[in-house]
Amino acid sequence: MSKIVKFLKELATPSHSMEFFHKPASNSLLDASELNFVRRNIKREDFGHEVLTGAFGTLKSPVIVESIFHSRIVACEGGDGEEHDILFHTVAEKKPTICLDCGQVFKLKHISSEGEVMYY
């Protein structure tokens, strides 16, 4: 095969294959494990909660965020039909956190062990 043909094939072939996006690296056992859980639709405990759902949080009735830690990061994308870009907030035990974009209120509930975490 001539050098020109090889060069043209390299130009036409993407630098990655689509398999890159679907298969973990062969030396990454954790990635393979995560992929198997996703394929079988099994929830792994070490990933934590999937999504917090419920009513829009207000000062009188905030969204309760459970955690075995003293703070947790939550993502807010709005509510009540008015969505906004995702904003990430650190919710701590001391006081409720209010989203500056939509006004939704989040409050951390510290729990003593992993066995007490609610699943949504």
UniProtKB/Swiss-Prot annotation:
Domain of life, source organism: Eukaryota
GO cellular component annotations of the record: mitochondrial inner membrane; phagocytic vesicle; respiratory chain complex IV
Signal peptide: none
Assembly mode: Component of the cytochrome c oxidase (complex IV, CIV), a multisubunit enzyme composed of a catalytic core of 3 subunits and several supernumerary subunits. The complex exists as a monomer or a dimer and forms supercomplexes (SCs) in the inner mitochondrial membrane with ubiquinol-cytochrome c oxidoreductase (cytochrome b-c1 complex, complex III, CIII). Slime mold cytochrome c oxidase consists of at least seven different polypeptides species, subunits I, II, III, IV, V, VI, and VIIe/s in order of MW.
Family membership noted in the UniProt record: Belongs to the cytochrome c oxidase subunit 5B family.
Record function comment: Component of the cytochrome c oxidase, the last enzyme in the mitochondrial electron transport chain which drives oxidative phosphorylation. The respiratory chain contains 3 multisubunit complexes succinate dehydrogenase (complex II, CII), ubiquinol-cytochrome c oxidoreductase (cytochrome b-c1 complex, complex III, CIII) and cytochrome c oxidase (complex IV, CIV), that cooperate to transfer electrons derived from NADH and succinate to molecular oxygen, creating an electrochemical gradient over the inner membrane that drives transmembrane transport and the ATP synthase.
Record-given protein name: Cytochrome c oxidase subunit 5
Source organism (scientific name): Dictyostelium discoideum
